[in-house]
Amino acid sequence: MNIAEYILSVLKSQIFVLLSWGFHRPVRLENGLRFQVQGFIHRGTVEVVYVEGADLFEVRTLNADGSIKQKEEDVYLDCLVNVIDGMVERTPNYKERVEQEYKLSR
């Protein structure tokens, strides 16, 4: 299994969170994975890169021109989904945003 497949398997371990990002178009990178999202916080490209010497990950959201919008370094494997979720989807008023977006009533 290459690193892109490994990262994807970690993300899929929390499939409902992954789907909430509007995850699509995964692309293998030399040392990671790039994909598109349509979250409440970020719509566009996310890159997850394995930092081999540290055995950690770097997560980046990118602007449309490819420049780095936000970067989180030294991300442990077991925190990967949570860190990406905080950069892409989860807002302080997440429950209300979901209800509003999908016109759900209590």
Region locations from a protein language model:
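Short, surface-exposed coil-to-beta transition loops
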Residues: 42-46
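A generic beta-sheet turn/junction motif
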Residues: 39-41, 52-54
